[in-house]
Amino acid sequence: MRLTFLGHACFLLETSRARLLLDPFLTGNPAAAARAEDIACDYLLLSHGHEDHTGDALALSRRLGAPIIANFELAEYFAAQGAKVHGMNPGGGFNFPFGRVKLTLAHHSSSAEAGLRPIYLGSPCGLLIQADGKTVYHAGDTALFLDLQLIGKAGIDVALLPIGDNYTMGPEDAAAALDLLRPRLAVPMHYNTWPVIAQDPARFAALAAAGGHAVKILAPGATLEV
């Protein structure tokens, strides 16, 4: 299994049977390591409805015929625009041809902009992906909460955690989350895209190391073998 960081919270996860694009925000992303028009994937997985996580989902789904896997309301929102979808809800899992996806709880919000007010688009989620004998957890934009320890019981190989603060966990809370999740490895995300979420990932790595946790900092475009 290969994991490539494409910037912000977007990752390409390549399993032996499928290519999964997580939170596909490339167009308009100042940290993007790829162009949406150059991306190929078999599935699109969305943690919640905010534009910096869904930005290219509809265009990619239409171009590639790739189903969008997301919470029910978000899936229906894209289905109404012609996308193939598979709707789920937090706590539910489904066995896809490539492996299993379970949506986990996440404490955040989920909406799309529509004129002067946002449209509510279901519960924000984390993505727990099991394939090729490995487990990857994409935390979405969650805040720190105690029940992360229940998610950790899945035996996580790689946890993708936001560290940008302001909208999500900051470095301190993300390091505390590792005490609950206990993954084999953590990768920081959702930072330095804009000044409001500017962070030094080395500080997160140091806080994590003090708790006995391993961190791999990926520059946009870098790849990790899981």
Annotate each language-model stretch with its function.
Residues L12-H50, G55-R62, E73, S109-Y120, ...:
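Pre-active-site segment of Zn-dependent metallo-hydrolases
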Residues L21-P24, C41-G49, I69-F72, Y137-G140, ...:
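Active-site neighborhood of phospho(di)ester-bond hydrolases with catalytic His/Asp-centered motifs
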Residues L13-S16, F96-P97, I129-D132:
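Active-site beta-strand termini and strand-to-loop segments that position acidic
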Residues M1-R19, L26-N29, R100-K102, R203-G211, ...:
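Zn-dependent metallo-beta-lactamase
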Residues P67, A79-G93, A175, D179-V226:
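Binuclear metal-ion centers of metallo-dependent hydrolases, dominated by the metallo-beta-lactamase
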Residues G28-N29, H50-G55, A75-F78, G92-N95, ...:
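Active-site environment of divalent metal-dependent phosphoester hydrolases
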Residues E113-D179:
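Active-site-proximal loop/helix segments of hydrolase catalytic cores
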Residues G55-E113, P118:
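Glycine/small-residue-rich loop that forms an oxyanion/phosphate-binding "nest" at active or ligand-binding sites
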